[in-house]
């Protein structure tokens, strides 16, 4: 039995000395191959007596198992080491040196800037941000928001529909961010104070419309929300956003399926020059729509309209960016023109804050 111990010690030393996958494979062949040292011992089992097979045979099998386990473990360790070495050799420095010239630095897209500005304003009022999917069901995009069957927005010429699924249901690219209102009411108990920025999609394209555009809307749900609250919130927003001391607003009766009463909001401005000036002048410009949340919408959100009420408003981010920063054509927002970005973009480190200034 001594020779088995000696052989095991020798083989274990060879396994430990192997430095790569080729050398450990050579050890395996020398020990466990057809003519390997352990394989030759295994061939003697057939000529052993039953008594000898119980002792020496068991020892030979134990040697085989021990050597096999050691080789497999070493092979795995060497393979991992080879992968680590390869990864280290292939390391790429993805960092970039500081660009020496301000002209070479990237710019923040105006839409990203506007979202940050609006988030700063409403965040100071105690609102949080809510988000939802761009691909919506008919229920969340239309039915839950009180759009009746036959409403023009449900037509193919206005909305991007997907092919029906196996259940016959057609999903849509959401036509507004309002479905998030329902999802929030389902998931959260009042009071609710949220803003919902995001992409929306409609079949429209010209200098002031795009098939994909950005909206932001707000929702407040509690037991005492009223029209006076809407007016205060929107006046404070417009003063801060357009960076003027005073704004004059007018609320015109309108119709939206998801609010009752509904209003379109105009802001007084001066349109005599190339850039619209707010807080002065005698002209009027529509900037958003708003209203008290319709009782049917509250019911679809799982709330009792006899206990809760709310108000909501919505506006196009692209449009208010054009108004604030004097951008003439909405289509330029999506053309990826570096020259346009260099002109209208914002410096990356100038994050809008109420105390530091919204538009640096």
From Swiss-Prot:
Entry binding sites for Mg(2+): 260
GO MF terms held by the record: ATP binding; magnesium ion binding; phenylalanine-tRNA ligase activity; tRNA binding
The keyword Aminoacyl-tRNA synthetase belongs to this UniProt entry's keyword annotation: yes
GO terms for biological process, alphabetical: phenylalanyl-tRNA aminoacylation
EC class: ligase
Superkingdom of origin: Bacteria
Keywords: Aminoacyl-tRNA synthetase, ATP-binding, Cytoplasm, Ligase, Magnesium, Metal-binding, Nucleotide-binding, Protein biosynthesis
Entry GO CC: cytoplasm
Principal subcellular localisation of the protein: cytoplasm
Subunit structure: Tetramer of two alpha and two beta subunits.
Signal peptide positions (record): none
Native source species: Rhizobium rhizogenes (strain K84 / ATCC BAA-868) (Agrobacterium radiobacter)
Subcellular location, record wording: Cytoplasm
EC number(s) recorded for this UniProt protein: 6.1.1.20
Protein name, UniProt field: Phenylalanine--tRNA ligase alpha subunit
Family recorded in the similarity comment: Belongs to the class-II aminoacyl-tRNA synthetase family. Phe-tRNA synthetase alpha subunit type 1 subfamily.
CC cofactor: Mg(2+)
Catalysed reactions listed for this entry: tRNA(Phe) + L-phenylalanine + ATP = L-phenylalanyl-tRNA(Phe) + AMP + diphosphate + H(+)
Keyword Cytoplasm: yes
Cofactor notes: Binds 2 magnesium ions per tetramer.
């Amino acid at each position: 039995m001594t020779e088995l111990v000696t052989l095991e010690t020798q083989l274990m030393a060879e396994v430990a000395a192997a430095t790569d996958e080729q050398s450990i494979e050579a050890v395996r062949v020398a020990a466990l191959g057809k003519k390997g040292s352990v394989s030759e011992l295994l061939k003697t089992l057939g000529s052993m007596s039953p008594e000898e097979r119980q002792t020496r045979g068991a020892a030979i099998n134990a040697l085989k198992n021990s050597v096999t386990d050691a080789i497999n473990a070493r092979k795995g360790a060497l393979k991992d080491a080879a992968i680590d070495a390869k990864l280290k050799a292939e390391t790429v420095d993805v960092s970039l040196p500081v660009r020496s010239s301000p002209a070479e630095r990237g710019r923040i897209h105006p839409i990203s800037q506007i979202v940050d500005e609006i988030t700063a304003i409403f965040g100071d009022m105690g609102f949080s941000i809510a988000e939802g999917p761009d691909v919506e069901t008919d229920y969340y995009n239309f039915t839950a928001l009180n759009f009746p069957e036959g409403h023009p927005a449900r037509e193919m010429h206005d909305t991007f529909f997907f092919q029906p699924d196996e259940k016959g249901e057609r999903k849509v690219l959401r036509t507004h961010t309002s479905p998030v209102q329902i999802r929030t009411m389902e998931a959260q108990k009042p009071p609710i104070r949220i803003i919902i920025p995001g992409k929306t999609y409609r079949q429209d394209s010209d200098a002031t419309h795009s098939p994909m555009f950005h909206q932001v809307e707000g929702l407040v749900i509690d037991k005492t929300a009223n029209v006076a609250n809407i007016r205060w919130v929107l006046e404070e927003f417009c003063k801060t956003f357009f960076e003027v001391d005073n704004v004059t607003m007018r609320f015109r009766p309108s119709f939206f399926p998801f609010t009752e009463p509904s209003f379109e909001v105009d802001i007084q401005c001066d349109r005599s020059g190339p850039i619209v000036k707010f807080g002065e002048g005698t002209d009027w410009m529509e900037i958003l729509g708003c209203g008290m949340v319709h009782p049917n919408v509250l019911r679809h959100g799982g709330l009792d309209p006899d206990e809760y009420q709310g108000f909501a408003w919505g506006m196009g981010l692209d449009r208010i960016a054009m108004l604030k920063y004097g951008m003439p054509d909405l289509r330029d927002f999506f053309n990826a023109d570096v020259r346009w970005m260099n002109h209208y973009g914002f410096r990356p480190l100038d994050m809008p804050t109420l105390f530091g200034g919204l538009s640096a």
